[in-house]
Structure formats: structure tokens, C-alpha cells
């Protein structure tokens, strides 16, 4: 695993080096990252962790598309998977809250890429849930927005998360 700063050469080098790229940048920075990484992302699994929020912290896209789908259009050679956007950062290392696993969703059109991300979610400790095709990112992004609104807007804090109960 390699963390990348904001230097353009570091972004290009890391994109070329990695098999899987986790895109955890502000939504407004996606175009610059795509331009900077260029074709180095072709053939890679790109995990879109972004939340499609505008500068005023409102949902930037509706239910006719998603940030992940728009990213896939910009990176036609990549295998985009929407994941981790519904989880606050402090829970990323264990996937748990108070000893209970949080749910992490993964939506994508490439079965192998999605299986890779689901395996990573399970390895971290999340209850990994296949959320279907990439178009279901249209539902995951508003869920991430709800989490942000509960945590920050309604001041419930970030020591919270979602858990899907199923049999």
C-alpha cells in the first residue's frame, strides 16, 4: 500500500505501480486526478470512495447518474467499483464499531474487480455486501451523504455507521 500526496508525478507513478487504486479525494478534484494519472489507470481496479458533494456540502448529482458512473466514463479502460463511501474514516482500519462489524457496500460492473474489493472489505473486518452493478452507486452516494449529514449536520458525531441486517 502506498499513500500519495498532491504531487502530480507521485500520482502518475503510483497509478502505474498499483494494481488497485483507492480514489479518496474531494469530489471536485476527480477531473484533475484523472488528467494527472492519465492512461496509467487503464486495466486497474479503481475504488471510488468519494462522495458526490458540491462546495456547499450538498449532493451534486441526483438519481440519474452517480459520481462513480461519471468516473467510469472518464476512465473507460479502468474497472470502477464504488465502495467505502458510507463509512467514516476512523472506522476504516477495523471495520467495527463497539465490537460489531459495520456494513461496507461495493457496487461495480466488473465481477472480478468487485470481488477484489469485497475481499478487501472482509479482510479489514467489515460485513461486505455486494450492492450490485455500478448504477447502484446512485443509491450508495446519497447513503454516504446521509451519514455525513447525521454525523456533522445533526452533530451526532462520526462514531457511528450503518449495519445491514439480513439472513
Model regions: which residues?
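Structural/interface elements that position substrates and couple domains in central-metabolism enzymes
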Residues: 3-5, 57-61, 127
